[in-house]
Amino acid sequence: MFPMVTGFMSYGQQTIRAARYIGQSFIITLSHTNRLPITIHYPYEKSITSERFRGRIHFEFDKCIACEVCVRVCPIDLPLVDWRFEKDIKRKQLLNYSIDFGVCIFCGNCVEYCPTNCLSMTEEYELSTYDRHELNYNQIALSRLPISIMGDYTIQTIRNSTQSKIDEEKSWNSRTITDY
Amino acid sequence: MSLPLTRKDLMIVNMGPQHPSMHGVLRLIVTLDGEDVIDCEPILGYLHRGMEKIAENRTIIQYLPYVTRWDYLATMFTEAITVNAPEFLENIQIPQRASYIRVIMLELSRIASHLLWLGPFMADLGAQTPFFYIFRERELIYDLFEAATGMRMMHNYFRIGGVAADLPYGWIDKCLDFCDYFLRGVIEYQQLITQNPIFLERVEGVGFISGEEAVNWGLSGPMLRASGIQWDLRKVDLYESYNQFDWKVQWQKEGDSLARYLVRIGEMRESIKIIQQAVEKIPGGPYENLEVRRFKKAKNSEWNDFEYRFLGKKPSPNFELSKQELYARVEAPKGELGIYLVGDDSLFPWRWKIRPPGFINLQILPQLVKKMKLADIMTILGSIDIIMGEVDR
């Protein structure tokens, strides 16, 4: 009889303890009702990417000297550099250049090591297509500039709170440069 | 219908590889007697990509983007060991600033990894709320990473002899803000979790590992420190500049899942302490060792001295590994992450053996879950903290 009573008592105490801590947890949860959501409605709102963001690669045909450093530092030797040695000018003449973005992992090695800075990373990251062969960009597709997020009036851009007004002016200027 | 009749009508249950609480693609074949676990056989290899073999056909620069795919939650550590091993092999010094940047990045990455351990661990125990809270803080860390490196997870930031780029303007302040914010976050987690009796019932005394056992099984990281052994490679090996900061090794002596939880929570606080100190006294100077490309005969002047001549801008993509071998290791959030590197006087490593902490820590699992209940498998597996990307490689 006696152990049963003490058993009930300790069980009751445990229950009260559990209820108290659940209450405490709920207070913490409720304290979160007062804040704004952290997520954004992606296709309609977009956050501005950081300056170093590694998106689709931009390529300037005229700057390239066909040295193939981008191929050597690429983990999978992806960039396809098609050149011919011109005897009269004793230079390599670049004929074609293409990168398959279906395979590229955007590690940025090629951009980092390019001696003439003809490669650069853009802010474009929406590369979905219905056909994966469309992702194989040749030099013409590679030289297209991405549409600035700021310039797209259907999209509301979300600014990081830490970015100051100077940044704001700068990005508006960059819009006028990027957006023809 | 005839089932193989075993000793006491044992039931064999297959958990995984698609089970949500298997943390990836781990498969467990569990032999059950009612609710009790009689035997457990882990089956690995569902995420095997041949990372060691790939390394043998890549220069270090080419291989760096791959390494973040081992342990994809503690990405900076895999990069750190990938550059540390060749650096030690070739005796390359790195500038102080680069070393400090590395420390800050590593500790941020440690926090991110521990956070994404905490969330799923609690979710395994049935507490879903922390799973959403941790993503808030983790997102801030990844914002910091994106600002400095260009990507959230696949950074490709560390280079032989330094880091790829200096910290962007204003990053330091942002990092300090994060530290202040995160300390409050940790307090919130502790209020939410640590004293909760339901949580304590699930973890106290579950998955006990004694100190001797932990050493004998080769465990490392929080698994080892939760069993009362104060072994932290940051203190033991003195790599990077960890000896210049004031911090303590987090350890507990109980050896159960609760102790492992406490060790990890404590480590997050210690990491914040390290970051705050590192950010406070980060020196100026080059962020990259520009010596890597120097000719051998010009090596008379002292490193970073006035007379010192910097030659190259970037470390050469044709970085050659001399014919030596060594074992380098760092303290990753999951334990000791090591590389056994054999050079062959060529651009490619002759052998690139990875010692992943998760793989070694996982081997104690069958012993821990025996004679426990079925529901305790989740707790124990969660407290081990495995990432199948590095277990299978």
From Swiss-Prot, chain A:
4Fe-4S ferredoxin-type domain location? 55-84, 95-124
Alphabetized InterPro entries for the sequence: 4Fe4S_Fe-S-bd, 4Fe4S_Fe_S_CS, NADH_quinone_OxRdtase_chainI, NDHI
Q: What class of enzyme is it?
A: translocase
- E.C. numbers: 7.1.1.-
Reactions catalysed: a plastoquinone + NADH + (n+1) H(+)(in) = a plastoquinol + NAD(+) + n H(+)(out); a plastoquinone + NADPH + (n+1) H(+)(in) = a plastoquinol + NADP(+) + n H(+)(out)
Q: Chief location of this protein? A: plastid
Membrane topology, from the record = Peripheral membrane protein
Sites binding [4Fe-4S] cluster 1 sit at C64, C67, C70, C114
Q: Name one GO cellular component term.
A: plastid
What Gene3D superfamilies does UniProt report for this protein, alphabetically?
A: 3.30.70.3270
Which cofactor does the UniProt annotation name? [4Fe-4S] cluster
Q: Which GO terms describe its biological process?
A: photosynthesis, light reaction
What function is annotated for this protein?
NDH shuttles electrons from NAD(P)H:plastoquinone, via FMN and iron-sulfur (Fe-S) centers, to quinones in the photosynthetic chain and possibly in a chloroplast respiratory chain. The immediate electron acceptor for the enzyme in this species is believed to be plastoquinone. Couples the redox reaction to proton translocation, and thus conserves the redox energy in a proton gradient.
Which family does the record assign? Belongs to the complex I 23 kDa subunit family.
Which PANTHER family does the entry mention? Answer: NAD(P)H-QUINONE OXIDOREDUCTASE SUBUNIT I, CHLOROPLASTIC
Protein name (Swiss-Prot/TrEMBL): NAD(P)H-quinone oxidoreductase subunit I, chloroplastic
UniProtKB/Swiss-Prot annotation, chain B:
Major location category of this protein: plastid
InterPro entries hit by this protein? NADH_Q_OxRdtase_suD, NADH_UbQ_OxRdtase_49kDa_CS, NDH1_su_D/H, NiFe-Hase_large
**Which controlled-vocabulary keywords does the entry list?**
Chloroplast, Membrane, NAD, NADP, Plastid, Plastoquinone, Quinone, Thylakoid, Translocase, Transport
> Which reaction is the catalytic activity of this chain?
a plastoquinone + NADH + (n+1) H(+)(in) = a plastoquinol + NAD(+) + n H(+)(out); a plastoquinone + NADPH + (n+1) H(+)(in) = a plastoquinol + NADP(+) + n H(+)(out)
Gene3D superfamilies in UniProt: Cytochrome-c3 Hydrogenase, chain B
Q: Name one GO cellular component term.
A: chloroplast thylakoid membrane
UniProt EC number = 7.1.1.-
From the Swiss-Prot or TrEMBL record, state where the protein is found: Plastid, Chloroplast thylakoid membrane
Which residue ranges run through the membrane?
A: none
Q: Which enzyme type, at the first EC level?
A: translocase
What is an example of a GO molecular function annotated in this UniProt entry?
quinone binding
Biological process (GO) annotations held by this record are:
photosynthesis, light reaction
What family is this protein classified in? Belongs to the complex I 49 kDa subunit family.
Instruction: Report the function annotation for this chain.
Output: NDH shuttles electrons from NAD(P)H:plastoquinone, via FMN and iron-sulfur (Fe-S) centers, to quinones in the photosynthetic chain and possibly in a chloroplast respiratory chain. The immediate electron acceptor for the enzyme in this species is believed to be plastoquinone. Couples the redox reaction to proton translocation, and thus conserves the redox energy in a proton gradient.
Beyond the main fields, what else does the record say? There is a 56 residue fragment from the N-terminus in a second position on the plastid genome (corresponds to 9311163); it is not clear if this is transcribed.
* Quaternary structure note: NDH is composed of at least 16 different subunits, 5 of which are encoded in the nucleus.
Q: What is this protein called?
A: NAD(P)H-quinone oxidoreductase subunit H, chloroplastic
